[in-house]
Amino acid sequence: MVWPFLTIYTSEKLLLPMAAVTSLMTFNSVSGFVASIAAGSLVDYFGRKGIMVVGLFGSAVVYLGYIFAVDYWQFGLLMFASGMFGPLYRVGTDAILADMVPPEGRAQAYSLFRMGRNVGVALGPILGGLVLSRTYNIGFMIAAIALASFGLIIMLFLRETLQKQENARRETLQDQLRVLSQALKNKVFVRMVGSFTLMEICATLMWVILAVYAKQNYGIQESRYSWIPTTNALMVIFLQVGITRITQKYPETKVMPVGAAFYPVAMILVAISGSFWGFLLAMVVMTFGELITAPTATAFVANLAPPDQRGRYLGFFGLAWYVALSVGPMSAGFLTDSISIHAPWYAGAIIGVVSVVAFLSLRKFEPTETKLA
């Protein structure tokens, strides 16, 4: 509801150069990176339910904090806290699904969960845009109340799915770091993560920068802009299954470069457009790339990983977003201040082309299980 417009809020509240405003996302990405690694051990040690509740209540407090923040350091602290609390709920839900669903049904369970989440993503920006175009404070309060209410529901009605085993050894953070060290020695995995991270830098520009870019330079208000992220969510809901049925007929290393090629096109469309419809078209183009690449890349990593380490490899693969978030928005802010408002999008297009080339370099690597059909 609020997240797509957060850069607008901080920009208008702080009245600082764009580079300073976008650098706040670095606080979020750094803490989110650390929390994503630690969350797995936390949910295994303390239980899924408790960690999820902490994440939801913590996020609620952060949203309330935005109402009172007036200085850069206060926003930085809140962004850091947001990055710490956010992954706790996500990792907890993933663990609960794994606990409740047998291995042969997990792919479908995660797919249904992703579709359900995107229903919220579709409705949230519309409601948020209507409220935030009038007052951000009410929007923050609604978001905080919703998160706290959901946390209370989980606390009261969700059962703990972690089975306590007296003699079983639980994975520690040290174990996860050791597996991460092993994964980083896998050159194909590292190349894959690097390729995906470059592509995700383009995505961060669309999700973090586009809203403030559209409002400050073209007067597109939150209530109208909200249809752009909503379009992304609706496309995921209605097109993901059909597109995956097509792409799974081909090797992942041939599919991923095709999907990645949509991202630089989206960047160029933003750069040359100056209207709502141009920005909407750019989001549609990028979303097609997401629909093609996201599930395919996940399958590639899963097939690349040792069978007993697939979950952790996928977890490490998810860190690509936080790396991209630490680079993309801050670089965009610097380019905006030092060159022009269009510079970040042309730079994003170049990075997108590099990601396509990087994905093409993976074609000589084809894990034995990558073909899904």
Roles of regions detected by a PLM:
Residues G50-L64, K254-L269:
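Structural signature of the two symmetry-related core transmembrane helices
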Residues M1-S29, V190-S195, M199-I228:
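Helix-loop boundary and gating motifs at the non-cytosolic
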Residues S29-I37, V121-A122, A233-V241, L325-S326:
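Residue-level signature of mid-helix packing/kink "hotspots" within the transmembrane helices
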Residues V34-V70:
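Conserved MFS/SLC helix-loop-helix module at the cytosolic interface between two early adjacent transmembrane helices
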Residues M79-V119:
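Cytoplasmic helix-loop-helix junction between adjacent transmembrane helices
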Residues R159-G194:
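Juxtamembrane intracellular "pre-TM" segments in multi-pass secondary transporters
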Residues A35-G47, L239-E252, T336:
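Helix-to-loop junctions at the C-terminal end of transmembrane segments
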Residues I154-A168, S361-L372:
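Helix-loop junctions on the cytosolic side of multi-pass membrane transporters
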